[in-house]
Amino acid sequence: MTETLVFASAVDPVEPWRAALEALLPDVRVRTPEEIGPGDDVRYALVWKPPAGFFARHPALRLVTILGAGADALVGRDDLPDVPVARLSDPEMARMMTHYVLFAVLRYARDMPAFEAAQRAGRWHYVHPREAREIRVGVLGLGELGGAAALELARQGFSVAGWSRTPKALPGIDCHAGPDALVPFLARSEILVVMLPLTPETRRLIGADAIAALPRGAKLVNVSRGAVIDEAALVAALASGHLGGATLDVFETEPLAEGHPLWTMENVLVTPHLASVAIPASAARQIAENIRRVRAGHAPEHRVDLTRGY
């Protein structure tokens, strides 16, 4: 019997996913919502921010997989059926995220924004490099992606601390945990990398008070979700100089609105939510295995708890 997986994403092309998944699961057909016909037995969904009412059209679903590591876009939906929801946990996604974080941290550690500005001005500008061990990097969020990034930064020689909601232990990382540890963690972070999931507890966690706790001139990198940071407070801190710069891959509203002040701030680098994306050739294996598990009556791996948001 042939089953159907419905694929819904406004930013991901379906063809690579269709090819990868149908090669692994010959009895599953991958279809977009527009391709679904009366004879399709839709049992699985692979989605990224599907439109309102999407799930109500597919009452026989047995598994929903999110095209990414974050589940916040599905929290609170009234059309989501009572079926397992799984996130992607792909080594290639973790590697891609780590590369982006390393790029952003190295750019600040080696004073590249100052050299970029000097070049635009036609001015020779020397800043003596600091040793990596002298530069204090803080990774806010030590989950799968945050932990991998923190370990790579430590391997590169940076002085790395991490903060998480519950205690973690990572080799070479100065780990902090819980609300009382947040301000001391921020106070030692010259470069702050935000890697938290978006939950009710983390929404705007980095507001004016948290930003004020960072050292003056600190740099901020956000690769989590835009709403973890109070955007107005962020803009104010960048304008005042309390924050020396920001590398932002995520925003409260995406795409970032035309005319938003972040577009024209000289100390801000904007990228369009691409720090890490799912790679069909590698991630399809996890999706196929989870479909096999659900068929056999087992829970999928990397299941999301929507009450927590991750």
Where are these regions (language model features)?
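C-terminal helix-to-coil terminal segments
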Residues: P84-L88, E92-Y100, A114, A169, ...
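Rossmann-like adenosine-cofactor binding region
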Residues: T166-P261
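Glycine-rich NAD(P)-binding loop of Rossmann-like domains
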Residues: E116-A148, C175
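N-terminal glycine-/charge-rich "phosphate-binding" loop or analogous flexible N-terminal tail
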Residues: M1-R43
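Glycine-rich, N-terminal phosphate-binding loop of Rossmann-like dinucleotide-binding domains
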Residues: K49, G68, V194-P197, V223-S224, ...
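Phosphate-coordination loops involved in phosphoryl transfer and adenosine-cofactor binding
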Residues: T2, D82, R133-R136, G217
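Short acidic low-complexity segments
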Residues: R29-D41, A52-F55, I173-R188
